[in-house]
Amino acid sequence: MGEQDEPRLIENLVSLRGRHVEPLGDITSVASYNGVEYQADIQRNRIWKAPTSAKRDVMINGKGYSLKSIRAAPPAIVNHTTRDKWLRVCNVVGLSIDPLDEMVSEYWKLRIDRKIGEDVLSSSNYCPFGSNPQRREYLRTLINYFLFDGTGAQDSAYPAEYILEFTDPLIPSTWRILDKRSAFDSMWPKMVFSIRSKKGMPPDYPSISATKKVLMEPWVRHIDSDYRGSLHIRTR
């Protein structure tokens, strides 16, 4: 059901064009992620599916929206990303990676001491990520980048300005608009942090270039016969 919710919502938005619909207001324009205005007779199978590199699924009144169905499986917020790519994002948003290095170091100590498992909830007393207001605000900036602006590999050519979260694509009263402050605050209580191996890590690690290895190494540990060092963030 959830996987069809996004095209159904876009189809509904097109039918509502020219009307005032809360929480969006007056809908004057509904376009694809790359700005092509949808025609009134658009069929669902003709709705443009955004590429994985795009952060927006649709443009409403010239603004980019990422669509999130509550009925679909929760998507990853940050998908198995190694330290070198987090460092790229830190450089883009103008932050030092040092606070994140500290959080990851604490995570590994807690995990090796068996106080936490691979997954740690943001609500856990042992969660080192965002364990104080300063860390949460630091993470807000980083996580917002992944939600709205790009990935560890690159800036998106199609960033989003808002998230349109919904339960039923046909009932506007179930829709909610999230911006860069409200999105993080809404997701934070449900966030799960993990450091994993199979996904995100180079398959030939540690036999990689010395330049890349030195950037990745601070997060990597050899546990259960595997090198683990990619940080994954999702909601539950």
List the model feature ranges, each with a label.
Residues 1-56, 60, 69-236:
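Short, positively charged
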